[in-house]
């Protein structure tokens, strides 16, 4: 235990917590331009072709963003919105593309969980 005199000389340092999404600069979302849209394979027990995009953000960061949902219309130079949220089986992918915002279309024919994929309510 430090003495009062020691604490006067050198106060206790606050704990600094590390962010999982440094490129967002404490913002909920960020806009960026796709520099490359491609597929990649997940880590060991899983097998698939996951759709991802390399994105140059407005703050200068270049990050990899996962494109969720079935099918997408993204290509190079598409302007997209990204949010935080990692993909556990893709190392280095710490961001998600927001579907239905800017140049990224929502998932067509989506019936359930529509808000997460930018799909409008279907006509009954």
Swiss-Prot record:
The GO biological-process annotations, alphabetized, read as: translation
Provide GO CC annotations from the record. Answer: small ribosomal subunit
Keywords from the UniProt entry? Methylation, Ribonucleoprotein, Ribosomal protein, RNA-binding, rRNA-binding, tRNA-binding
Highest taxon of the lineage: Bacteria
List residues, modification 3-methylthioaspartic acid: 89
Extent of the signal sequence:
none
Question: GO molecular function of the protein, one example?
Answer: tRNA binding
- Indicate whether Thylakoid appears among the record's keywords: no
| SUPFAM superfamilies, sorted | Nucleic acid-binding proteins
Q: Which InterPro entries match?
A: NA-bd_OB-fold, Ribosomal_uS12, Ribosomal_uS12_bac
A Pfam family of the record is Ribosom_S12_S23
KW Methyltransferase (keyword) present: no
Listed HAMAP family:
Ribosomal_uS12_B (MF_00403_B)
Role, per record: With S4 and S5 plays an important role in translational accuracy. Interacts with and stabilizes bases of the 16S rRNA that are involved in tRNA selection in the A site and with the mRNA backbone. Located at the interface of the 30S and 50S subunits, it traverses the body of the 30S subunit contacting proteins on the other side and probably holding the rRNA structure together. The combined cluster of proteins S8, S12 and S17 appears to hold together the shoulder and platform of the 30S subunit.
Q: Which family does it belong to?
A: Belongs to the universal ribosomal protein uS12 family.
Oligomeric form and interacting partners: Part of the 30S ribosomal subunit. Contacts proteins S8 and S17. May interact with IF1 in the 30S initiation complex.
What is this protein's name? Answer: Small ribosomal subunit protein uS12
Q: Tell me the organism.
A: Shewanella woodyi (strain ATCC 51908 / MS32)
According to the entry, what is the taxonomic lineage of the organism? Bacteria, Pseudomonadati, Pseudomonadota, Gammaproteobacteria, Alteromonadales
